[in-house]
From Swiss-Prot:
SUPFAM superfamilies associated with the record: Tetrahydrobiopterin biosynthesis enzymes-like
Protein name per UniProt: GTP cyclohydrolase 1
Domain of life assignment: Bacteria
Similarity comment: Belongs to the GTP cyclohydrolase I family.
Residues annotated as binding Zn(2+): C83, H86, C155
The protein's enzyme class: hydrolase
Molecular functions per Gene Ontology: GTP binding; GTP cyclohydrolase I activity; zinc ion binding
GO cellular component terms given for this protein: cytoplasm
Hydrolase found in the keyword field: yes
Keywords, ordered alphabetically: GTP-binding, Hydrolase, Metal-binding, Nucleotide-binding, One-carbon metabolism, Zinc
Length: 194
């Protein structure tokens, strides 16, 4: 398995902040169980935010002309992200549909990579959905794009209203799928079909 390149963070600053946070909540950062916690948490954040300085459209390195003019759908792309409001995870699945223009298609894994890059940063689900769609539009110039993201937010599960299992669904449509409701509904039905 290829090792993921981690975002370059100011490790010392991150570790010091985590150390201070542990003190702020009344913990002893020098006790045995917490000695390496600042280092571990800083490393985790470097992984969680590895997409922060990347552009999802740059993941579309493989573009082919296949004279395919019908919809391409990739469903159930799992992702994890971090809510920028509460700094707790949200996770779920992205479903992506695009209608090629002039036969321009991309490798299917590139769609999953774009989701990965866009999700690995402090994020809002609404923005995540739009960033995925916009990356595809910029890279392939398709006739239409539809992205549906469904996710469970730990800020609704662990705190506040405490409603585990609740899902948030967001969509972003571009091109034909924004302009033509019947086309959008047809593709949406395919995306959500079990």
């Amino acid at each position: 398995m290829k090792r993921e390149r981690l975002m370059s963070i100011n490790k010392e600053k991150a570790e010091a902040a985590i150390y201070q946070f542990l003190e702020a909540i009344g913990e002893n950062p020098n006790r045995e169980g917490l000695l390496d916690t600042p280092k571990r948490v800083a490393k985790m954040y470097a992984e969680m935010f590895a997409g922060l300085k990347k552009d999802p459209k740059e993941e579309f390195t493989a573009v082919f002309t296949e004279h395919h003019e019908d919809v391409v759908i990739v469903k159930d792309i799992s992702f994890y992200s971090m809510c920028e409001h509460h700094q707790v995870p949200f996770y779920g699945k992205a479903h992506i549909a695009y209608l090629p223009s002039d036969g321009r298609v991309t490798g299917l894994s590139k769609l999953a990579r774009a989701v990965e890059v866009a999700s690995k940063r402090p994020q809002l689900q609404e923005r995540l959905t739009a960033q995925i769609a916009d990356a595809l539009v910029e890279a392939l110039h398709p006739t239409g794009v539809l992205v549906l993201v469904e996710a469970e937010h730990m800020c609704m599960t662990m705190r506040g209203i405490k409603k585990p299992g609740s899902k948030t669904i967001t969509t972003t449509a571009r091109g034909l799928y924004k302009e033509d409701r019947s086309e959008r509904q047809e593709v949406m039905a395919l995306m959500t079909k079990v």
